[in-house]
C-alpha cells in the first residue's frame, strides 16, 4: 500500500502503487509527467466499474479494478489492483501487471480469489496483431499484497467445492453440482490437494469436508 495514503470513500479515488510509484486517482484518473521536466504525460485510469468482494477474509467488502497506464510511448499496460475496506473507506494496494495491449474481459472475486479473464497474443505474434488467445490469471492476498499465484489456459477453469479425504475415499463435490466426483490418478496436483487438506485439517476426523477452490481442467 502507498505510504501515507488514507482511506477514501471510493476505490476510484484511492492511491495505488504502480511500478513502485504512488498514483493518486481522482474520479478514476491521474495524469503526471512521465519523467521530471518531460513534456510527455503518464496517464492512468480505471477501466470499467470496480468489482466487489472480500479479498482479505475480514468480512468487509473490498474492491478490485483494472488500471490502464499509458506512459506516452507505444505500450498500453493493464494492471489489476485491490482497494481494501478499512475504517469505512478504501485503501489502495499494489497494482499487478497483467499485460501490454491485452483485451480485458472479466474481473471477479471467488472465495477471496481474484479471477482475471482476458485475451492476449499467441507467442511470436506481433504486438500489432489483435489479441485472440483466451487466458485467465488468478491472484490472492499474500503478505498483505495482491499476488499472482497462477494462470489458466483455454479450457481450464476455477471451481469451488467440498473436498473430502479419508482412509479409502478422496472426493470433490462442486458447489454448483451436488454430485461428488472421485479424486483419482497420479497427477502432482492431487498430491497438492491432499497436502493442503491435511494442512488445513490437522486434527479433524477423516471424511470431514473442507471447502476448497481448485483450478485446472477435467
Range-by-range predicted roles:
Residues 1-55, 60, 64, 74-76, ...:
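Flexible low-complexity loop/turn motifs enriched in small/helix-breaking residues
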Residues 1-26, 105-158:
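Acidic, small-residue rich beta-repeat scaffolds with periodic aromatic anchors
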Residues 45-55, 103-115:
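Beta-propeller blade termini
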Residues 57-67, 112-117:
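Acidic/hydrophobic-patterned starts of short beta strands in beta-sheet-rich repeat architectures
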Residues 72-81, 124-130:
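Structural motif
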Residues 155-170, 213-218:
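Structural detector for short beta-strands of small beta-barrel domains
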Residues 170-190:
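OB-fold (S1/OB) nucleic-acid-binding surfaces
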Residues 191-215:
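Short nucleic-acid-contacting surface segments enriched for D/E, G, S/T with interspersed K/R
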Amino acid at each position: 500500500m502507498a505510504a501515507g495514503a488514507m482511506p477514501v470513500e471510493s476505490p476510484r479515488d484511492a492511491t495505488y502503487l504502480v511500478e513502485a510509484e504512488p498514483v493518486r486517482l481522482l474520479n478514476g484518473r491521474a495524469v503526471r509527467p512521465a519523467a521530471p521536466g518531460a513534456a510527455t504525460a503518464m496517464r492512468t485510469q480505471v477501466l470499467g466499474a470496480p468489482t466487489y468482494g472480500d479479498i482479505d477474509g475480514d468480512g468487509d467488502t473490498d474492491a478490485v479494478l483494472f488500471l490502464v497506464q499509458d506512459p506516452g510511448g507505444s505500450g498500453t499496460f493493464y494492471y489489476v489492483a485491490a482497494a481494501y475496506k478499512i475504517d469505512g473507506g478504501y485503501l489502495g494496494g499494489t497494482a499487478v501487471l497483467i499485460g501490454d495491449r491485452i483485451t480485458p474481459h472479466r474481473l471477479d472475486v471467488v472465495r477471496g480469489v481474484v479471477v482475471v479473464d482476458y485475451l492476449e497474443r499467441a507467442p511470436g505474434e506481433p504486438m500489432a496483431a489483435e489479441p485472440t488467445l483466451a487466458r485467465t490469471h488468478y491472484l490472492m492476498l499474500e503478505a498483505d499484497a495482491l499476488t499472482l499465484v497462477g494462470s489458466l489456459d483455454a479450457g481450464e477453469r476455477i471451481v469451488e467445492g467440498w473436498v473430502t479425504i479419508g482412509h479409502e475415499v478422496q472426493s470433490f463435490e462442486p458447489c454448483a453440482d451436488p454430485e461428488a466426483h472421485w479424486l483419482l490418478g497420479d497427477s502432482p496436483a492431487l498430491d497438492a490437494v491432499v497436502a493442503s487438506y491435511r494442512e488445513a485439517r490437522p486434527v479433524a476426523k477423516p471424511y470431514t469436508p473442507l471447502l476448497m477452490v481448485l483450478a485446472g481442467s477435467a
